[in-house]
Curated annotation (Swiss-Prot):
Pfam families: PseudoU_synth_1. Formation of pseudouridine at positions 38, 39 and 40 in the anticodon stem and loop of transfer RNAs. This is tRNA pseudouridine synthase A. The lineage of its organism: Bacteria, Bacillati, Bacillota, Bacilli, Bacillales. The active site is at D51. Its EC number is 5.4.99.12. It comes from Staphylococcus haemolyticus (strain JCSC1435). It is an enzyme of class 5 (isomerase). Homodimer. Substrate binds at Y109. Keywords: Isomerase, tRNA processing.
């Protein structure tokens, strides 16, 4: 049977989600538990592979098992063995043809920034610190230009290996907070470092060093050298995974054009 698991984690002490040859990862923690329960290796398949230091309010993975265990018992068993910086929120049995990555229709990220005269040690690893004043209105104007279907070659890591760098963004906005701002972005999928590059560009806009009018040209240029900065990982949160059309239409309306993945090569 196939089991779907909904989790959250504080990513500061992880080298990312995906298992590494050395170092602590989220995948490693779960596969260690499943190996102990099954007495053999059990691979998990996530909806997203977050990078080092990135957090998740919501993340899904699935695995196959021949153990006859109720969902609530799976949840209890995992939470009993997990460290304090990971929590299993929900477990359910799904159809054997369901694939956590392939059937993912969208993701929402939130990037948190606080502004102050000096760095706050209690925000370390949780939010990104910026000392300068920012023009939120101009930042939001620029953020809106990213909504739609575009080739984001110029706004991702040059290490990105996927064939197509075309992604559809349903939401891209700056939300002012008491301490600074959040950048909230929802899309069909995201390229390596894409959200962090978008944030870095928007911060430059807020400082008056870049302009919203540049976005169209930069998207067409597809040149990462024109957008050289990447925001730190510490402020980034995977906030929501969209596994059904209903989830997307609930948030964005029935007229939304849903982008479907053609292969597992997409994020």
């Amino acid at each position: 049977m196939r089991i779907l698991v909904n989790i959250s984690y504080q990513g500061s002490q992880f080298l990312g989600f995906q298992i590494q040859q050395q170092g602590r990862t989220v995948q490693q923690q779960f596969e260690k538990i499943l190996k102990r329960m099954h007495r053999r290796h059990v691979r998990i398949h996530p909806s997203s592979r977050t990078d080092r230091g990135v957090h998740a309010y919501e993340q899904f993975f699935h695995f196959d098992t021949d153990l006859n265990i109720e969902p609530k018992q799976w949840k209890y068993a995992m939470n009993s063995a997990l460290p304090d910086d990971i929590y299993v929120k929900e477990v359910q049995q799904v159809d054997d043809h369901f694939h956590c990555r392939y059937d993912c229709l969208g993701k929402r990220y939130r990037y948190k920034v606080y502004q102050a005269t000096h760095r706050n040690p209690f925000e370390s690893g949780l939010k990104t610190f910026i000392k300068e004043d920012l023009n939120y209105s101009k930042m939001n104007e620029a953020a809106k230009h990213f909504i739609g279907t575009h080739d984001f070659t110029g706004f991702c890591s040059q290490k990105t290996e996927v064939e197509s760098k075309v992604r559809t963004l349903y939401q891209s906005e700056i939300i002012q907070t008491d301490e600074g701002f959040d950048y909230v972005v929802t899309g069909s999928g995201f390229l390596y470092n894409m959200v962090r590059v978008l944030v870095a560009f928007l911060i430059e806009v807020g400082k008056g060093k870049r302009h919203a009018s540049e976005v169209s040209t930069l998207l067409n240029e597809k040149n990462r050298d024109s957008v050289p900065f990447t925001a730190p990982a510490e402020g980034l949160y995977l906030e929501k995974i969209y596994l059904t059309e209903k989830d997307l239409t609930t948030d964005f309306g029935d007229n939304i054009k849903i982008h479907r993945k053609k292969s597992l090569q997409n994020d």
